[in-house]
Amino acid sequence: GMDKASSGRVWVNNKEITKLNDKELIEYRRNDIGFVFQFYNLIQNLTAKENVELATQLCSDALNVDDILEEVGLQDRKNNFPSQLSGGEQQRVAIARAIAKNPKLLLCDEPTGALDYKTGKQILKLLQDTCRKEKMTVIIITHNTAITPMSDKVIHFKNGTAEKVEINENPISIDNIEW
């Protein structure tokens, strides 16, 4: 949904998104997809809470902003501006912003890249729990193969091509995974 397909077709949730025009694609991204990028894209003159609230104004089924900020461990930092937050805290604001939209599909590019081990596990648990509770599909792009046991499905890529697909019948809680 970020780029136009150069060939083939892409289906998501029984919808062929390759047939969507530009306006439909914008609506699809706005309503159905949440993004966590490696670069956080926070608005510098908005507080952490306001950055999350801004995203929730674009959708109709948003989650409670204060609850999500608490779940990412930022309840005491929600009134700080991005420049007053560490890189890990900024990453957690970006994650909260994406989750608060309550998207059908959440795409996370290295969501724990700037986080320490303990906070990384906290965020992965939040993603795992949110996926189950909200019936949200969460796709995590990562180089950390140690976390694959938490997943329902693992797709290994090499040189931009899906090389192997593994189905995990019994995903493990992130609480029980060490790396």
Regions found by a protein language model. Give the residues of each.
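Conserved beta-strand-loop-alpha-helix hinge in the C-terminal portion
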Residues: T161-W179
